[in-house]
Amino acid sequence: MISNAKIARINELAAKAKAGVITEEEKAEQQKLRQEYLKGFRSSMKNTLKSVKIIDPEGNDVTPEKLKREQRNNKLH
């Protein structure tokens, strides 16, 4: 996961961009940091979804087959 310092830098650069005083070098840094943040977020979300089991109101497991296969491959359920 991305460090708190990098998140603070992302926010700092966003504030500068909003104020209209960001340089091209800072824009490139901002884009790189945002991509790093999104990569970590997507990875975390994917891992969370891999551990989900969907149950309908009658109590039946209605987890999609694709997700069940992923869970079996990763031995989560």
UniProtKB/Swiss-Prot annotation:
Residues 63-77 have a biased composition (Basic and acidic residues). Induction: Repressed by LexA. Keywords: Cytoplasm. The keyword Cytoplasm applies. It is found in: Cytoplasm. It holds the Pfam family DUF896. The keyword Cytoplasm applies. It comes from the Bacteria. Its main location: cytoplasm. Residues 56-77 are annotated as: Disordered. One of its GO terms (cellular component) is cytoplasm. InterPro entries: DUF896. Belongs to the UPF0291 family. This is UPF0291 protein YnzC. The gene is ynzC.
